[in-house]
């Protein structure tokens, strides 16, 4: 009976199905697909041999790609060294004359000589060097062709003439000196009696730069420039300095006599360079003081100097309303002889806003003297209204001169503060100089 119990008992169908299910679950967990489980032993061996051969092929491919990668790295290193040698200074300065699109469509016959440079597709360039030689470059060089345009200044290799680097735009050194690096310290509060003029200047110059969207919402075009005119000493240049101090724009100060040059075309080139520099550093303001030096009415003259001044003014007219208007460049011009200016300068579209600076009235004169006396040690008994009544026909500069003369008189007598009598004596001093000047010019 014990031997009979040692014999294996046949498994039931339920137990066999459970084992098969367990095997399938383990196969799925190991990543073995159902297709492999249904394959025979010979098929599995054959599949394994195929996979081994594919692995060998992939390993050889990886080895080949690794060798190619190393060869490419060596080639890149070699080319980098060649570029470094070619980029050694000095460069030959050249100008880009023209950019050409090259796309050869004609097919060469079999056996014909083929010029590889002529078969390149893309951009080619024509340059003119500083030695006055013109070259055609089938290959531009190290600079992207999309970043080049005719007229650009570039540095090329002196042997191969390949473009190695773009150079900054060349401007006249006199134009660069026109840029105001240090901001003036004047403020609108330092100007007395010109509230209306300050408002007109802010509306025409400052507002279009700081709040451009207001003009776009209304659909109006802001003024291109402002002409400030009036007698000498009424605050035209002072207001321009205050405008330069209050805005963050680049400020270029030109003097009219500075644009009158001896050589033909030199003054016009200064005007072109000044506007080009202003466009590059936009937003910017160009202030032209003493505009009557170049803006006089045109007339027939046989003198070369007069014709050169007229050519300079024509270039200024062209820049004011050229073919490409620029709303980020504003022009402020000042003169005390508006009657002799050319009508072409005064028409709308060039200097749209005309701001008159009259002689200050009594209230304005009192305000001007108060402003210039703020930092002085002044006695409380000084009556500025009475001083303003005594300074009839005085401009702003003469009112300032009264304060300076009063301070000098107080200094002469060793006083520690300025009195009303000092101001009255200062008025007499300025009036005496004024009469002397009138008699001198008469």
UniProtKB/Swiss-Prot annotation:
Q: Where in the cell is it found?
A: Cytoplasm; Nucleus
One GO cellular component this record assigns the protein to is:
proteasome accessory complex
Main subcellular location of this protein, as a coarse class: cytoplasm
- Binding residues for ATP, per the UniProt record? 230-237
Q: Do you know which PROSITE patterns this protein is assigned to?
A: AAA
- Top-rank taxon: Eukaryota
**Phosphoserine found at:** 12, 379
Annotated keywords: ATP-binding, Cytoplasm, Nucleotide-binding, Nucleus, Phosphoprotein, Proteasome
Record-level Gene Ontology MF annotations: ATP binding; ATP hydrolysis activity; identical protein binding
InterPro entries found in the cross-reference section: 26S_Proteasome_ATPase, AAA+_ATPase, AAA_lid_3, ATPase_AAA_core, ATPase_AAA_CS, NA-bd_OB-fold, P-loop_NTPase, Prot_ATP_ID_OB_2nd
Which processes are annotated in GO (biological process)? blastocyst development; modulation by host of viral transcription; positive regulation of transcription by RNA polymerase II
Similarity section: Belongs to the AAA ATPase family.
Say what the protein does: Component of the 26S proteasome, a multiprotein complex involved in the ATP-dependent degradation of ubiquitinated proteins. This complex plays a key role in the maintenance of protein homeostasis by removing misfolded or damaged proteins, which could impair cellular functions, and by removing proteins whose functions are no longer required. Therefore, the proteasome participates in numerous cellular processes, including cell cycle progression, apoptosis, or DNA damage repair.
Summary of subunit composition and partner proteins: Component of the 19S proteasome regulatory particle complex. The 26S proteasome consists of a 20S core particle (CP) and two 19S regulatory subunits (RP). The regulatory particle is made of a lid composed of 9 subunits, a base containing 6 ATPases including PSMC3 and few additional components. Interacts with PAAF1.
Q: What is this protein called?
A: 26S proteasome regulatory subunit 6A
Organism, scientific name? Mus musculus (Mouse)
Protein encoded by which gene: Psmc3
